[in-house]
Amino acid sequence: MDLFALLRAGVRSGDTPDIGGSTDDRWRELYTAASSQGVSALVWDGIRRLPPESQPSRELRLRWAYNVERIERRYGQQRRRAAELAAAYAEAGIRTVVLKGLAVSRLYPVPEHRPCGDLDCFLCGDYERGNRVAEQVGAEVKRDFYKHSHIVFRGLTVENHRFCTAVRGSRRAKRFERHLQRLLAEGPL
């Protein structure tokens, strides 16, 4: 049983994993590996493409499905909190660009199955004003990092990036950063 075959089937619509039979012990190992790597929901999507006789035991399927439900609920909560914070930024006239995390999940067949730990955003030159707006809506803001602040808003962790890239110590990165910021200033991507 190959974790990568199941993962591939989970993220590529139409793929059916070519997997032989597997023991309960091997299925438990796969469950543990998928969970520890943060891909259990994606692997679950691959398992659901297997014929019933090739799937894990009912007990493990129920456990796996419950875990996937938790991931889906957390994703929904993250989306709602992100929308609330983005609305507060928009109301303050701050343009928000999502850099990764939740935005990347939209590229998956089932976005809710691509877990993310936080939301990374760039506020198009309004870094500090964005921090103040976040505080005004009840978020905790830590400004201890050169590249971004850490915002915790109703359970959602947000990295408000001062820069799109890591610019320290590299002229090339600084030039690239200026180029990206000019593109963002021109309007929607």
Model-inferred region functions:
Residues 1-117, 123-189:
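Conserved NTP-donor binding/palm subdomain of two-metal-ion nucleotidyltransferases/polymerases, i.e.
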